[in-house]
């Protein structure tokens, strides 16, 4: 039987438009001010040094780093330093009530149902763990983090790498064949399946005609107890 479900966020639990039309512009508008006001103290100075390490430029100036961050945002680069910085900026927005984390209406009832079945539920997203926690603790449905057993970001590996899913399995202590991954992205599901996981693809729009994964349009259609392991 399935013992753990790991779900993506963007396009899976959450409308992609919330991320691209609300979160990303909010962080972009405030990024330079956030960096310049805190460049001499933690956590900003540590994040800037992390970024210098990412781009292999230990002497990069703050101006150069800000330019790099804007470039990474334009490219939707999965930079750990950028994701952490965005998370700090989004925290202000969540706490101030500027927005709440969007969840599709079918998500929380399914999380409650699976939790009642003693299935552990984890989040795996390219967004930083702190940013993930903010979304689920300040969601449209309130704080639902009590339903979640843990969070993973790219520190366990990229989402299209097979090794990332093996790492998550080891960290949770759940064998790969008892892990179920939910995502809207075929290539991520391909990597999870190659690692030995079960997979279900969330299709919130048009079907993916190239996918070989089971496709559903709602969490209501996912019944882990019926998935053979």
From Swiss-Prot:
Domain of life of the native organism: Bacteria
Source organism: Cronobacter sakazakii (strain ATCC BAA-894) (Enterobacter sakazakii)
Protein name per Swiss-Prot or TrEMBL: Enolase-phosphatase E1
Assigned keywords, A-Z: Amino-acid biosynthesis, Hydrolase, Magnesium, Metal-binding, Methionine biosynthesis
Co-factor binding details: Binds 1 Mg(2+) ion per subunit.
Residue ranges, compositional bias (Basic and acidic residues): 220-229
Bias-annotated ranges (Polar residues): 208-218
Keyword field contains Oxidoreductase: no
Region feature Disordered, mapped onto this chain: 208-229
EC code: 3.1.3.77
Subunit comment: Monomer.
Pathways per UniProt: Amino-acid biosynthesis; L-methionine biosynthesis via salvage pathway; L-methionine from S-methyl-5-thio-alpha-D-ribose 1-phosphate: step 3/6; Amino-acid biosynthesis; L-methionine biosynthesis via salvage pathway; L-methionine from S-methyl-5-thio-alpha-D-ribose 1-phosphate: step 4/6
UniProt xrefs under CDD domains: HAD_EP (cd01629)
Record lineage: Bacteria, Pseudomonadati, Pseudomonadota, Gammaproteobacteria, Enterobacterales
GO biological processes: L-methionine salvage from methylthioadenosine
Similarity-based family: Belongs to the HAD-like hydrolase superfamily. MasA/MtnC family.
Catalyzed reactions: 5-methylsulfanyl-2,3-dioxopentyl phosphate + H2O = 1,2-dihydroxy-5-(methylsulfanyl)pent-1-en-3-one + phosphate
Keyword Hydrolase recorded: yes
Pfam families given in the database record: Hydrolase
One GO MF term attached to the UniProt entry: acireductone synthase activity
């Amino acid at each position: 039987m399935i013992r753990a479900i790991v779900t993506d966020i963007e396009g899976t639990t959450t409308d992609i438009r919330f991320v691209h039309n609300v979160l990303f512009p909010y962080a972009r508008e405030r990024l330079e001010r956030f960096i310049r006001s805190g460049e001499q103290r933690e956590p900003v100075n540590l994040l800037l040094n992390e970024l210098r390490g990412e781009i292999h430029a230990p002497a990069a100036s703050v101006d150069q780093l800000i330019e790099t961050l804007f470039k990474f945002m334009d490219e939707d680069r999965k930079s750990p330093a950028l994701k952490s910085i965005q998370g700090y900026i989004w925290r202000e927005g969540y706490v101030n009530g500027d927005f709440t984390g969007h969840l599709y209406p079918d998500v929380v009832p399914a999380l409650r149902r699976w939790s009642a079945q003693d299935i552990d539920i984890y989040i795996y997203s390219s967004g930083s763990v702190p940013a993930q926690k903010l979304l689920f603790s300040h969601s449209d449905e309130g704080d639902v983090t009590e339903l979640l057993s843990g969070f993973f970001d790219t520190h366990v590996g990229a989402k299209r790498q097979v090794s990332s899913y093996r790492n998550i399995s080891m960290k949770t202590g759940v064998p790969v064949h008892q892990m179920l991954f939910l995502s809207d992205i075929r290539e991520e599901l391909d990597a999870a399946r190659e690692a030995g996981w079960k997979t279900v693809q969330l299709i919130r729009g048009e079907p993916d005609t190239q996918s070989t994964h089971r496709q559903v349009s709602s969490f209501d259609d996912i019944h882990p107890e019926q998935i053979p392991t």
